[in-house]
Amino acid sequence: MTEQNDDQRGFSRRSTLAMPAAGLGIAALGAALSPIGVAEAATMGDEFIPPHATKLKALTAALAKAPRRRDFKSVPMILTSADQYDSEALHLLFAYSGGPKQVWDNTALDSPWLNLMRNSMNAQIWSWKHPDFIAISATHGTAHLALYDKYIWDKYLTKFTGGKVKSNTWVDVPAASKVSASDYNNPKGVFSPLDNSIVVLQKRGAVFCACHNEVWELTMGILKKGINPDKLSHPAMAAEFTNHLIPGAVLTPGVVGTIPQFQLAGYQYAK
């Protein structure tokens, strides 16, 4: 698939690749989907999720309440217990009865991954009239760097990237997000290419899944480069990175191994 990159942000994939059921019970919310048009858009105001997306709104609210354990002292290479990852949030996603449902295999930070997710959401919601459409990012590879907070970037990642990237700009909120969502066809508005942001997509109902395997392998590479100011063990550093995933991220025990679980739950694979 070829569409314009988010920004490219000066980040070379070649260089970075060298870096080492809770069922929601929402039958009551299953009202018939209504086509989205100008009249409904006018009622959106500052809301990024369409008014008739009742199932998506219910899921988003449930996910916000689902626990995210972020107090680890040490984590193993392979997770074997549900309390080591965000099991409740994942099962909410598996049980989601809205749709269509799409899971994106996102691996490259310098690819147009956010742009593609945004375009998919726009077409499904506005063109195909599916307000309860959900897009999941199964994030790994260099794209996973976008799922760490400022603490991790300041402490490790700016140095790890050789100063090529100094902060996590993928979570910045662009000025376009301030435009009223009711003006959905505004080429400089909320749904435009100027608003490719993880935070904005989350507000629209997209979910970004993190990968424990990527956490483990990234921290292994960081240790090999000698970036370890606190002299942490590998399990302790992996725990620190896990504790500093961005708000709203859903930790999987391994995202490549979790994609089949999404597919079993009816999600369509996209790359």
Label for each model-derived stretch:
Residues 11-38:
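N-terminal export leaders
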Residues 31-86, 92-93:
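C-terminal segment of N-terminal export signals and the immediately downstream linker at the start
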